[in-house]
């Protein structure tokens, strides 16, 4: 090959290395190593000092058996001369004043040093250099000329990369500003929806159907039973019903019915007279009296003891009661709303809940959708919770689009309450104003909910619909090994998956129970039982 053709091929090789679609650091390292093969370098490198808005750039050869260029520092005197003259040729560094302070530790024999300045952004700010063994027939002038051409190509490549990088940063900043603007508009809309629907945020079909139904229910005084998983917003819906009813200016009283004794529940709900029991030093008005003319929400109604259920049934039917320790019958006008996440049908079958009370309170049920069925609501809720956090703590945090995408893919078995906790925890620990997907606890395996769902899938492989009492228990486990269905337990997560699978099969079958039974490989009777157990009202759906 002619010498001119050989040089053309070499220039093509280094141009190809510089134009490769890789990161700048990788591109320049490949360029320097390609150059080292052409120029028979012992070692060489490229150095571009840091400038305003740009970081320092270095690249070094990786020749096996040769001294490392990455650990070598070119003398300042040599650098200054390159910057002044644009090039430098030192046939033997051992005899050069420029390198006198570095000869002792180098110990690599007679060595030539050749360098050329690199112009970046119309300023000479860096250099391309290499060393090679001193040879009598070496044409230094030709090599430094070739090195200057290579340095010119490298400078252009660096300028191109920096220009693209600056444009990408500008574009990303503009995109972020636009996203922040959309977030602000969304938060404003969310606040308007919040005011309109009394704290209920969202616009999914499932949620809006429940909201519209609740507003229709508000027009009458009928007893309402709110059903849904924990954290689905039963109290918010109770307030919505109250605020859209004719009782909106009257009291709204809420009472959580935990596993209290009959006497304590009776005292809390009906009140007591002075001296009715030890510690009753004064007359006390109960929740029913406090709610007279308004609305009373009794949450966790499935937890009240059987002995108290008969007394509650009397109040529901007749609207009258006596205070504990009293003889006077009191009558009240109260709109009753009950709420539960418990399987009341199973409780009735097990004798834990009175059948007559069940029919009395379940006449007008409203099933609240879990968060995983509310398509598109998670970003709206997350932004609203973050806005509330910002207002409470004087912060100015916002979500990156990737963060909202990540949240939208989460199951959240604890529903809205769990989502709010997730947002608050992440915001509290946020190290910058922009929350990204990597900031969430589940990314470091610190999310209990994530581990809970993984555990359910890994432990059981698949979930079957519960069969009626007396048949094989859920998942084939002994009846006494089935975990308690308490909020946050694996039993709850299992229950949620069962319900999802049941509804999916029914949707696929067009809500035909016989077809759904074939899909699930169950009998129609088992599917009917599962519908009752999970509170799925086929007629409503």
Swiss-Prot record:
CDD domains: AAA. Keywords: Activator, ATP-binding, DNA-binding, Metal-binding, Nitrogen fixation, Nucleotide-binding, Plasmid, Transcription, Transcription regulation, Two-component regulatory system. InterPro entries: AAA+_ATPase (IPR003593), GAF (IPR003018), GAF-like_dom_sf (IPR029016), HTH_Fis (IPR002197), Nif-specific_regulatory_prot (IPR010113), P-loop_NTPase (IPR027417), Sigma_54_int (IPR002078), Sigma_54_int_dom_ATP-bd_1 (IPR025662). Residues 429-498 are annotated as: Inter-domain linker. GO terms for biological process: nitrogen fixation; phosphorelay signal transduction system. ATP binds at residues 228-235, 291-300. Coiled coil: none annotated. Residues 499-541 are annotated as: C-terminal DNA-binding domain. A divalent metal cation binds at residues 442, 447. Transmembrane segments: none annotated. Signal peptide: none annotated. PROSITE patterns: SIGMA54_INTERACT_1 (PS00675), SIGMA54_INTERACT_2 (PS00676), SIGMA54_INTERACT_3 (PS00688), SIGMA54_INTERACT_4 (PS50045). It comes from the Bacteria. Residues 513-532 bind DNA. The keyword Transcription regulation applies. Residues 170-191 are annotated as: Disordered. Required for activation of most nif operons, which are directly involved in nitrogen fixation. Interacts with sigma-54. PANTHER family: PTS-DEPENDENT DIHYDROXYACETONE KINASE OPERON REGULATORY PROTEIN-RELATED (PTHR32071:SF117), TRANSCRIPTIONAL REGULATORY PROTEIN (PTHR32071). This is Nif-specific regulatory protein.
């Amino acid at each position: 090959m002619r010498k001119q053709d050989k040089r053309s091929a070499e220039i093509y090789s280094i141009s190809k290395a510089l134009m490769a679609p890789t990161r700048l650091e990788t591109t320049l390292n490949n360029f320097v190593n390609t150059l080292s093969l052409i120029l028979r370098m012992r070692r060489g490198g490229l150095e571009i000092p840091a400038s305003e808005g740009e970081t320092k750039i270095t690249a070094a050869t990786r020749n096996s058996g040769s001294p490392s260029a990455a650990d070598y520092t070119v003398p300042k005197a040599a650098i200054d001369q390159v910057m002044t003259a644009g090039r430098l040729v030192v046939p033997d560094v051992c005899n050069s004043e420029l390198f006198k302070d570095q000869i002792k530790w180098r110990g690599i024999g007679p060595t030539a040093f050749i360098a050329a300045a690199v112009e970046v952004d119309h300023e000479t700010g860096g250099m391309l250099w290499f060393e090679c063994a001193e040879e009598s027939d070496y044409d230094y002038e030709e090599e430094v000329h070739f090195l200057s051409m290579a340095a010119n190509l490298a400078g252009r490549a660096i300028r191109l990369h920096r220009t693209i990088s600056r444009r990408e940063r500008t574009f990303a900043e503009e995109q972020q500003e636009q996203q922040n603007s959309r977030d602000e508009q969304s938060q404003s809309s969310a606040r308007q929806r919040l005011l309109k629907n009394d704290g209920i945020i969202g616009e999914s079909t499932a949620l809006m159907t429940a909201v519209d139904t609740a507003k229709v229910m508000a027009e009458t005084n009928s007893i309402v039973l709110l059903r849904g998983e924990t954290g689905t917003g039963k109290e918010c819906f109770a307030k919505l019903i109250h605020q859209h009813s004719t009782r909106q200016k009257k009291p709204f009283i809420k009472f959580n019915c935990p596993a209290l004794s009959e006497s304590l529940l009776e005292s809390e709900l009906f009140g007591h007279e002075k001296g009715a029991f030890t510690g009753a030093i004064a007359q006390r008005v109960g929740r029913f009296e406090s709610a007279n003319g308004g609305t009373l929400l009794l949450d966790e109604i499935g937890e009240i003891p059987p002995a108290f259920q008969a007394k509650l049934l009397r109040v529901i039917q007749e609207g009258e009661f006596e205070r504990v320790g009293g003889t006077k019958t009191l009558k009240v006008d109260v709109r009753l709303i009950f709420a539960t996440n418990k399987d009341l049908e199973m409780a009735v079958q097990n004798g834990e809940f009175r059948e007559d009370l069940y029919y009395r309170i379940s006449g007008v049920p409203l099933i609240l959708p879990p968060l995983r069925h509310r398509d598109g609501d998670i970003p709206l809720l997350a932004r609203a919770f973050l806005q509330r956090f910002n207002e409470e703590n004087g912060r100015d945090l916002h979500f990156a689009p990737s963060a909202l995408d990540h949240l939208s893919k989460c199951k959240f078995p604890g529903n809205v309450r769990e989502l709010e906790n997730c947002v608050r925890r992440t915001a509290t620990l946020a190290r910058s104003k922009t929350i990204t997907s990597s900031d969430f606890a589940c990314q470091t395996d610190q999310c209990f909910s994530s581990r809970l769902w993984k555990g359910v899938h890994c432990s059981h492989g698949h979930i079957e619909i519960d069969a009626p009492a007396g048949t094989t228990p859920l998942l084939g486990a002994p009846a006494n090994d089935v975990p308690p269905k308490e909020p946050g337990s694996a039993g709850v997560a299992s229950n949620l998956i069962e319900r999802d699978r049941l509804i999916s099969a029914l949707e696929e079958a067009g809500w035909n129970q016989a077809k759904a039974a074939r899909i699930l490989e169950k009998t129609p009777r088992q599917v009917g039982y599962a519908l009752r157990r999970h509170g799925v009202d086929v007629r409503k759906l």
